[in-house]
A protein has these predicted regions:
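Domain-level signature for proteins that mediate thiol-based redox and metal-cofactor handling
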Residues: 2-92
């Protein structure tokens, strides 16, 4: 029997959480990939992830602002990220 089928819910959630954090790290290491390109190619972007994060928090009775959700997804305050990404794009 497959390990995934017999895995308890806690381990499954732990793996999903670790995978999500790895996705965020992957995106963070590729700041040059613009949200519009992600949206065109994958149908979602960093802003979508932050909105989904906020929506899931709300379902669980946790109030997270747009800026707080974006800070979690972007790994820094959103305005700081926008400034850095504009510098990266100009450099490229």
């Amino acid at each position: 029997m497959s390990n995934i089928l017999i895995m308890d819910n806690g381990k499954k959630k732990d793996l999903q959480s670790a995978t999500f954090e790895r996705l965020l790290k992957h995106l963070d290491e590729r700041k040059y990939v613009q949200n519009i390109d992600l949206m065109d190619l994958a149908g979602f972007c960093r802003n979508c992830l932050s909105r989904w994060y906020q929506e899931e928090a709300k379902k669980r009775g946790i109030d997270i602002s747009d800026l707080e959700a974006r800070e979690h997804i972007y790994g820094m305050p959103y305005l700081e990220w926008k400034k850095k990404i504009s510098e990266i794009i100009i450099f490229l």
